């Protein structure tokens, strides 16, 4: 059975947003649905999406592999994405990465034995003014991350708290600051 076999309403709603000849535009929402429900994108899901939108698995994989959001190996319940671009590096992201991987005992593509955590370095998360930044799953960013904030974040996640329930020491927030224009 395919992933989308029992999701016909979702498919109809998604495809209705695009002209019939533009079904390929639905690649992103279909990938996102798989990622949200399964936590990662299996090769057979790439093939299924390609069939549904009328393209090749190579094209679907090309779209999926462009974005760091999509995972191609199983991830932990909490997938920690550490920004690795210059602003975050200058603000201490490398030291946070080292602490994180040593503390959890895992590297990229690995999951902690309890299934809670996986880690990944990602390119710019777009919050250079609050560097260093970590994103947990698809949640708002954890900004101005220090070792103390990272320790509190890990403890809160281990305790089963939602991101917004975790008290982080120091100043900064859980989200990208919105600027009104």
UniProtKB/Swiss-Prot annotation:
Its cofactor is [2Fe-2S] cluster. NDH-1 is composed of 15 different subunits, Nqo1 to Nqo15. The complex has a L-shaped structure, with the hydrophobic arm (subunits Nqo7, Nqo8 and Nqo10 to Nqo14) embedded in the membrane and the hydrophilic peripheral arm (subunits Nqo1 to Nqo6, Nqo9 and Nqo15) protruding into the bacterial cytoplasm. The hydrophilic domain contains all the redox centers. This is NADH-quinone oxidoreductase subunit 2. It comes from Thermus thermophilus (strain ATCC 27634 / DSM 579 / HB8). CDD domains: TRX_Fd_NuoE. One of its GO terms (cellular component) is plasma membrane. Coiled coil: none annotated. NCBIfam families: nuoE_fam. It catalyses: a quinone + NADH + 5 H(+)(in) = a quinol + NAD(+) + 4 H(+)(out). Keywords: 2Fe-2S, Cell membrane, Disulfide bond, Iron, Iron-sulfur, Membrane, Metal-binding, NAD, Quinone, Translocase. [2Fe-2S] cluster binds at residues 83, 87-88, 124, 128. SUPFAM superfamilies: Thioredoxin-like. GO terms for molecular function: 2 iron, 2 sulfur cluster binding; metal ion binding; NADH dehydrogenase activity; quinone binding. It comes from the Bacteria. Belongs to the complex I 24 kDa subunit family. Binds 1 [2Fe-2S] cluster. This [2Fe-2S] cluster is referred to as N1a. The keyword Membrane applies. NDH-1 shuttles electrons from NADH, via FMN and iron-sulfur (Fe-S) centers, to quinones in the respiratory chain. The immediate electron acceptor for the enzyme in this species is menaquinone. Couples the redox reaction to proton translocation (for every two electrons transferred, four hydrogen ions are translocated across the cytoplasmic membrane), and thus conserves the redox energy in a proton gradient required for the synthesis of ATP. PANTHER family: NADH DEHYDROGENASE [UBIQUINONE] FLAVOPROTEIN 2, MITOCHONDRIAL (PTHR10371:SF3), NADH DEHYDROGENASE UBIQUINONE FLAVOPROTEIN 2, MITOCHONDRIAL (PTHR10371). The subunit can be divided into two domains: an N-terminal four-helical bundle (residues 2 to 74) involved in interactions with subunits Nqo1 and Nqo3, and a thioredoxin-like C-terminal domain (residues 75 to 180) that coordinates the binuclear cluster N1a. It is found in: Cell membrane. It holds the Pfam family 2Fe-2S_thioredx. It is a peripheral membrane protein. Disulfide bonds join 144-172. Its EC number is 7.1.1.-.
